[in-house]
Amino acid sequence: MKQKRFLSAVLTGAMTVMLFAGCGSNTQADTRAENTVSEQVEETEAVGGETSGALVIAEQGIFSAGGTTIVSDGEFDPENQWEETGAGQTAHVDHANVLYQIPEEETGLPMVFLHGYGQSRMGWMTTPDGREGWSDMFLRKGHSVFLIDEPHRGEAGATSVSGDISTKTLDQRWYTQFRIGRWENGQSVVNEGSQFPNDENSIDQFFRQMTPDTGMTSDMGGDFDNDVVAQALASTVDEVYERSGKDSILVTHSQGGGPGWTAAKYTDHIAAIVAIEPGGAPSSDSEDYQTVLEKNI
């Protein structure tokens, strides 16, 4: 129990000093898009330890985890496969899509990353100005990484729930929600001390990271299905255990925090949970909280 809590505390401390795109600030530096290559290397060394130059990946791939299968009534007609009723057909839906990479020298526990609202796994892989993301940093430290697109998001868009994908113009809402700064008179005004790159190309790249939901009737996340995501997340953790024989460190961000706590109900293979600015935390009398305690996470 003490070992797991110590591991969680150490990871939380290490991660706190890292810049997550749109969510970090540091009054001691103003990292700009025109950083030189040497400055980028220095930053990587300061955050993730020494870098050996080339990042060597021993294995990588993609798989789906969790989900369900829907079967329609009727009989499928192979001569009329385009008919609109879907009679007798199946739909594989509500799963997570997982990209994984295993470093050549794997020395640590595997790490499973779940993004927040409006995001996909891309947010863990790079920054808007093209620097290494958290996944590369932890690969360099000997951890295999498993990067999730949650159900109804990104490459896991197949859904059991009908809904609309919003075409509203929402870029400035995301800019404000991520607490990057203020958008005034058509201009980006970053918060004082922010390390967010304030050049035109980086802001463009940030806005293009935004990823809509399928199977949603609201662009405010009001009908987000916490349990569906938690079950897919737990299935991912179980798959990692089947492949590696190791429990996983679960890293969540923002909206992903909720499913992260709940996932502990559905798997016995979470070594630690590191929640970065979670959208909420379970109350001490909740089932999620008690489960985390009982399983010594």
Model features per residue range: what roles?
Residues 228-248:
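Conserved acidic catalytic loop of the alpha/beta-hydrolase fold
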